[in-house]
Amino acid sequence: MTDSTYDVPRVRTYLQGLQARIADALGALDGTPLATDAWQRGPEERLRGGGCTRILEGGRVFERAGIGFSDVAGDALPPSASAARPQLAGRGFEALGVSLVLHPRNPYCPTVHMNVRMLIATKPGEAPIFWFGGGMDLTPVYPFEDDARHFHQVCKDALDPFGAELYPRFKTWCDEYFFLKHRNETRGIGGIFFDDFSEPGFERSFEMMQSVGDAFLNAYLPIVERRAALPYGERERDFQAYRRGRYVEFNLVFDRGTLFGLQSGGRTESILMSMPPVANWRYNWQPEPGSPEARLSEFLVPRDWV
């Protein structure tokens, strides 16, 4: 995070193109185009800049699919961004990224999250400091080992050209980050997660971020295509809503991206589009031993998938 040579317009152009490509692919799969909601913040507001939200609700395949692009700037990094780097507290910042969460209708199709982003911290009289972050992770309700292996293999293939050490490092980081401490379980079967990444310099770091973003459709769409037509009933939908409750708990209690957006005065509708459209909670409920629902617990611990 010390190299101050970077190219924001190139990053912006890539991110906007990535959002469009993913939105087009999801719309084609679902049969329903994603709506476009462009937004802009005024110069007098705490957070300046704008973005574009692509959103689908009530689709054939996706009950909710949201892909957000934002490019915003503020006068002081929020606590969620500077907690691990107290030397950056109070600096101005620019943050640009693409973030998506897809909630399929069929309980046999896993929820997925992907994010790629760049942040720049600025201070008068000092060189700017930039870094990249992002990753993707899969959250099944009724898990399939083939899906987990495929997802992790694509993640590994995206990272291997940049160093064989990156996939195990980012995989472990993902397992540790997407963990519900109060439930003592992972959010799903993991994937990759990285932050504060700029060690190879701007060009190589940017290439790595692009490789992660470009890998998303290959990591996820084959899984949806395999599972979207599987038959399901009320039992499966009920369990899906119950497990979605865990997703809500993580996003509102632990997720740094959600906290960053809310603490910095971000656009609430775009920040909370990651929430599932339907979720429920049951008091002290446990699945029947040996049931398909009970099998999920075997997957909610870190495992080597490739």
Swiss-Prot record:
Pathway recorded for this protein: Porphyrin-containing compound metabolism; protoporphyrin-IX biosynthesis; protoporphyrinogen-IX from coproporphyrinogen-III (O2 route): step 1/1
Entry keyword set: Cytoplasm, Heme biosynthesis, Metal-binding, Oxidoreductase, Porphyrin biosynthesis
InterPro entries the record matches: Coprogen_oxidase_aer, Coprogen_oxidase_aer_sf, Coprogen_oxidase_CS
Residue numbers marked as site, Important for dimerization: H182
GO MF terms held by the record: coproporphyrinogen oxidase activity; metal ion binding; protein homodimerization activity
Biological processes, Gene Ontology terms: protoporphyrinogen IX biosynthetic process
A Gene Ontology cellular-component term: cytoplasm
Record keyword Cytoplasm present: yes
Cofactor(s), by name: a divalent metal cation
Enzyme class: oxidoreductase
Residues binding a divalent metal cation, per UniProt: H103, H113, H152, H182
Main subcellular localisation: cytoplasm
KW Metal-binding (keyword) present: yes
Coiled coil: none
Catalyses which reaction(s): coproporphyrinogen III + O2 + 2 H(+) = protoporphyrinogen IX + 2 CO2 + 2 H2O
Family annotation (PANTHER family): COPROPORPHYRINOGEN III OXIDASE, MITOCHONDRIAL, OXYGEN-DEPENDENT COPROPORPHYRINOGEN-III OXIDASE, MITOCHONDRIAL
Membership in a protein family: Belongs to the aerobic coproporphyrinogen-III oxidase family.
Role this protein plays: Involved in the heme biosynthesis. Catalyzes the aerobic oxidative decarboxylation of propionate groups of rings A and B of coproporphyrinogen-III to yield the vinyl groups in protoporphyrinogen-IX.
Subunit-structure text: Homodimer.
Protein name: Oxygen-dependent coproporphyrinogen-III oxidase
Classification of source organism: Bacteria, Pseudomonadati, Pseudomonadota, Betaproteobacteria, Burkholderiales
Gene: hemF
